[in-house]
Amino acid sequence: MKEKFIALLTFTSSLKNFGIKFIRVAILVVFVWIGGLKYFHYEADGIVPFVANSPFMSFFYAKDAPEYKDHKNPEGAFVPENRAWHEANRTYTFSYGLGALIMSIGILVFLGIFFPKVALVGDTLAIIMTLGTLSFLVTTPEVWVPNLGGDEFGFPLLSGAGRLVIKDIVILAGAVVLLSDSSQRVLKTLKK
């Protein structure tokens, strides 16, 4: 039994390089998919609470934060008045730019499989982006269960939006591992 356990550990201990490449592919898939969704109105509408409440991003929008609450669309719904408001707010223009940025970061991270110097840029940007996303836990009221009369609300009870945001901590951890790997690979070439 001990021999089988040692054989299993020997195999799993050899997965580090595969795991690092797999993280790069996973980030590519998630970032290209999510970035691509930013070109659809329902997704652009959905990020408005995050952007509007962020001190780092709210300047991209034309309208003040509280106004968006009157113009929320259920996913898949088309409400002409709300669409006009989002167009005037620059919701879609910002979302298109954000989508392009997210997809570009995913591609740069993926290219790190082949080009460690490119990976340094992509990995660093992935870290910055996920830190920005995690900042929404502080800036966006919608990440916590609202007080609607029940006894379960507020911190630490994450809403659907909050549960979505908190998962970025896993991407952040992966990006830190990738940055370390890229740095080691670049250092090897510089020491030659």
Positions of predicted regions on the chain:
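Membrane-interface extramembranous regions
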Residues: 1-192
